[in-house]
């Protein structure tokens, strides 16, 4: 009789793909099937994030709830980035946890579920970490890792300590996975890496040397692939070749994530980001010039240690000049093992909160203007989700969330939609064809 697996995923798209890898491994080798019912689960997993302090606190509140809800004999496992940096401390704080797997150790999940108090948190450079069977959370798109880890060592970021140095996955393995996904019906390919456009700088062995721009072209040539998305690129590596291929290739979706973090050059230097305010503005302007329909999203940290009022105003200036379609903004959160956590000039909570509120309020005003301008336009929308209110939703080519009245027969299809109404985060429309 098949065993039941319940899995909760916190954090980024990399974690989503790691969870898909875990599900594939357990279903193929250990006869587990996925369940959404916690109470019937034989195995309960939480795949964790540690990029800020809040998700770490959430881990322990969640596993505490799992311990109360689990049926007799059910096992609880903690995976992901928090597992990497806390290690066996998780057992001390939550003794009912049965095993701990770091972010670079998910290939050991079969061993973990069969071994009492199993723990593995070392940085694994073995190619087994990305040679998993196929499982997709959505039949209409496929998340595919092209690299693992990060070399940037930004002073605020824990990721290099939890996911290790950057290793590119060989192009032949990526293309094989793309072909498999397309054959199985995924028309959209979503490429993942901490710095995707740094792809090709280091492999774990002797492999074909290829950069990210050329990899995008190769993937676009795979039969059945209609759309390509990726996250996250680094502004430092947005050279003209990359921007040209992004702008001109008809299969690459016209949405670009450009993580700003700060609009002040001094703060960027202390963050160890490697670029200046002027470089970022130049790349954003070049992108909008080459690709007028592009939507640009970004990450912003306010109240980085030592950030003055004037330096924060530089961030507001970039917000005004680029007019991002979407921002992911947070107060600086000190992380263990990072340089910035040792800085003595931390910003007080009141100042940090005020800056975040101002940033988000102004962006909401910008977003309202951007969204209102979509009304009356006809957008190509790839439908992939049934909504609870009875509609069908998908993403436009430039990443707007669009909803229409319809049924599941629309899923997996790209159709033209005329936008008839707008809300801050959703466009509403009717089929134009």
Swiss-Prot record:
Quaternary structure, from the entry: Monomer.
Segments forming domain MTTase N-terminal: 3-118
Subcellular location field: Cytoplasm
GO CC terms of this entry: cytosol
Molecular-function GO term, any one: 4 iron, 4 sulfur cluster binding
Record-linked SMART domains: Elp3
Annotated EC: 2.8.4.3
Official protein name in the record: tRNA-2-methylthio-N(6)-dimethylallyladenosine synthase
A Pfam family that the UniProt record links to this protein: Radical_SAM
Organism: Campylobacter curvus (strain 525.92)
Annotated TRAM domain residues: 372-433
Cofactor note: Binds 2 [4Fe-4S] clusters. One cluster is coordinated with 3 cysteines and an exchangeable S-adenosyl-L-methionine.
HAMAP family with a match to the protein in the record: tRNA_metthiotr_MiaB (MF_01864)
Keyword vocabulary terms for this entry: 4Fe-4S, Cytoplasm, Iron, Iron-sulfur, Metal-binding, S-adenosyl-L-methionine, Transferase, tRNA processing
Binding site for [4Fe-4S] cluster 1: 12, 49, 81
Disulfide bond residue pairs: none
PROSITE patterns noted in UniProt: MTTASE_N, MTTASE_RADICAL, RADICAL_SAM, TRAM
Cofactor requirements of the protein: [4Fe-4S] cluster
Record's function text: Catalyzes the methylthiolation of N6-(dimethylallyl)adenosine (i(6)A), leading to the formation of 2-methylthio-N6-(dimethylallyl)adenosine (ms(2)i(6)A) at position 37 in tRNAs that read codons beginning with uridine.
SUPFAM superfamilies xref list: Radical SAM enzymes (SSF102114)
Annotated Radical SAM core domain residues: 136-369
Binding site for [4Fe-4S] cluster 2: 150, 154, 157
Known catalytic reactions: N(6)-dimethylallyladenosine(37) in tRNA + (sulfur carrier)-SH + AH2 + 2 S-adenosyl-L-methionine = 2-methylsulfanyl-N(6)-dimethylallyladenosine(37) in tRNA + (sulfur carrier)-H + 5'-deoxyadenosine + L-methionine + A + S-adenosyl-L-homocysteine + 2 H(+)
PANTHER family: CDK5 REGULATORY SUBUNIT-ASSOCIATED PROTEIN 1, MITOCHONDRIAL TRNA METHYLTHIOTRANSFERASE CDK5RAP1
């Amino acid at each position: 009789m098949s065993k039941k697996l319940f899995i909760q995923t916190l954090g980024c798209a990399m974690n989503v793909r790691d969870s898909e890898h875990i599900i594939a491994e357990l279903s193929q080798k250990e006869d587990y099937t996925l369940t959404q019912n916690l109470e019937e689960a034989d195995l309960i997993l939480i795949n964790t994030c540690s990029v800020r302090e809040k998700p770490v606190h959430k881990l322990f509140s969640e596993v505490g709830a799992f311990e109360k809800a689990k049926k007799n004999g059910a096992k609880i496992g903690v995976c992901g980035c928090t597992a990497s940096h806390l290690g066996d401390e998780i057992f001390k704080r939550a003794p009912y946890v049965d095993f701990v797997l770091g972010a670079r150790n998910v290939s050991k999940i079969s061993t973990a579920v069969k071994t009492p108090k199993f723990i593995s948190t070392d940085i694994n450079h073995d190619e087994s970490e990305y040679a998993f069977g196929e499982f997709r959370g959505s039949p209409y798109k496929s998340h595919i890792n092209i690299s693992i880890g990060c070399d940037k060592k930004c002073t605020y970021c824990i990721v290099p300590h939890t996911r290790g140095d950057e290793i590119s996955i060989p192009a032949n393995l990526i293309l094989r996975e793309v072909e498999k996904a397309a054959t199985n019906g995924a028309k959209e390919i979503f490429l993942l890496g901490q710095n995707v456009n740094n792809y090709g700088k280091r492999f774990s062995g002797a492999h074909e040397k290829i950069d990210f721009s050329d990899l995008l072209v190769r993937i676009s040539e795979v039969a059945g692939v209609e759309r390509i998305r990726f996250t996250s690129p680094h502004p430092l590596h947005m050279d003209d070749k990359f921007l040209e291929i992004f702008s001109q290739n008809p299969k690459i979706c016209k949405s670009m994530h450009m993580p700003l973090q700060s609009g002040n050059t001094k703060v960027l230097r202390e963050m160890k980001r490697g670029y200046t305010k002027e470089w970022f503005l130049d790349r954003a302007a070049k992108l909008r010039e080459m690709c007028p329909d592009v939507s640009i999203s970004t990450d912003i940290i306010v109240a980085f240690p030592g950030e003055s009022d004037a330096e924060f105003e530089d961030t507001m200036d970039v917000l005004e000049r680029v007019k991002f379609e979407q921002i992911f903004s947070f107060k600086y959160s000190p992380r263990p093992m990072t340089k910035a956590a040792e800085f003595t000039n931390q910003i007080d909570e009141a100042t940090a909160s005020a800056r975040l509120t101002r940033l988000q309020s102004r962006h909401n005003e910008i977003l309202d203007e951007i969204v209102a301008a979509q009304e009356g336009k006809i957008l190509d929308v790839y439908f992939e989700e049934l909504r609870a209110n009875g509609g069908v939703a998908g993403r436009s080519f430039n990443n707007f969330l669009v909803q229409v009245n319809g049924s599941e027969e629309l899923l997996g299809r790209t159709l033209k939609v005329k936008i008839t109404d707008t809300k801050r985060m959703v466009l509403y429309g009717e089929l134009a064809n």
